[in-house]
Amino acid sequence: MNPVVLTMILLTIMLGTVIVMTTSHWLLVWIGFEMNMLAIIPILMKKYNPRSMEASTKYFLTQATASMLLMLAIVINLIHSGQWSTTNPLDPTTSIIMTLALAMKLGLAPFHFWVPEVTQGIQLSSGLILLTWQKLAPMSILYQISPTINLHLLLLMSLTSILIGGWGGLNQTQLRKIMAYSSIAHMGWMTTIMIYNPTMALLNLTIYIILTTTTFMTFMMSSSTTTLSLSHLWNKMPLLTSAVLMTMLSLGGLPPLSGFSPKWMIIQELTKNNSIIMPTIMAITALLNLFFYMRLAYSTSLTMFPSTNNMKIKWQFNNSKSMNLLSPMIILSTLILPLSPMLALLE
């Protein structure tokens, strides 16, 4: 893709998200979402082939439906209140429709079907944008309307997302699908706490973006798209192998790594609000995610698949890909947990 065109597209994606996050007018929120959706289609189709074409079409149809629902909610809100302001409280009907629209944009269950299919059909760099940056705008609106969200609807979708995100990734060997199911599960954790403590949901989103970015950068650096190709990382980049081990375990939420921090705080917050069954189910289901990440870590770092002698000398050749940005990202994705006591300042 032409660098000038790519720069313009990326700037449009950023501008659309910034408009959604900063405006207080519902029509501008919708326009920001539309800019964001239309600008990312060329990014998804960067490597033109039938799979990326299919993925882009699925993404467009899903997001267009979500935008239609969002506009319906905005119009109903305008009829009831006579105002375009996002600070105005929503009535129950508008809140439910808007929550469903945002759930579709985020990939929450039962609107999660597009996430693994779209992520699998695109490049790793496009998948990184799809699973990180594209979550910012819907989460910011969910944050704004959190006081008026229907509690039971959101908790039902959140718990279903955590369950599906854990079960769906168990039988996968494609790394992009594993990351997609992990994203569904993480979105479930974030939206669970959104009503009780919206600030904690944003903190969870930040840690999720750090962990996912680090993982995708590792995949891109090693050109790995399957479990088998990742298992050959030891002879391409021996230094990166141990980093992959720690990042995978952190993404699975194993203490004392960074990924455990949001789970710990969310379970603590839910318990404070006299919710016992919900965090218990969530904690048990988190073991499913941890299992498939431990399986990835084991196949990458702790075992050696049968290979030819020629493969064992790959590490001697120079690698042109730079690791400058990856080092601080790996540190952030593994060592944030000791800072958790300082987060009491947010309350």
UniProtKB/Swiss-Prot annotation:
Keywords: Electron transport, Membrane, Mitochondrion, Mitochondrion inner membrane, NAD, Respiratory chain, Translocase, Transmembrane, Transmembrane helix, Transport, Ubiquinone
InterPro entries: Complex_I_Subunit_2 (IPR050175), NADH_DH_su2_C (IPR010933), NADH_UbQ_OxRdtase_chain2 (IPR003917), ND/Mrp_TM (IPR001750)
Transmembrane segments: 3-23, 25-45, 59-79, 96-116, 122-142, 149-169, 178-198, 200-220, 237-257, 274-294, 325-345
GO MF, one annotated term: NADH dehydrogenase (ubiquinone) activity
The keyword Chloroplast is assigned to this record: no
Catalytic activity: a ubiquinone + NADH + 5 H(+)(in) = a ubiquinol + NAD(+) + 4 H(+)(out)
Single GO BP term: mitochondrial electron transport, NADH to ubiquinone
EC number: 7.1.1.2
Primary enzyme class: translocase
Subcellular location(s) per record: Mitochondrion inner membrane
Recorded GO CC terms: mitochondrial inner membrane
Membrane-related topology note: Multi-pass membrane protein
Family: Belongs to the complex I subunit 2 family.
Subunit structure comment from the entry: Core subunit of respiratory chain NADH dehydrogenase (Complex I) which is composed of 45 different subunits. Interacts with TMEM242.
Task of the protein: Core subunit of the mitochondrial membrane respiratory chain NADH dehydrogenase (Complex I) which catalyzes electron transfer from NADH through the respiratory chain, using ubiquinone as an electron acceptor. Essential for the catalytic activity and assembly of complex I.
Protein name listed in UniProt: NADH-ubiquinone oxidoreductase chain 2
Organism: Paranyctimene raptor (Unstriped tube-nosed fruit bat)
Gene coding for it: MT-ND2
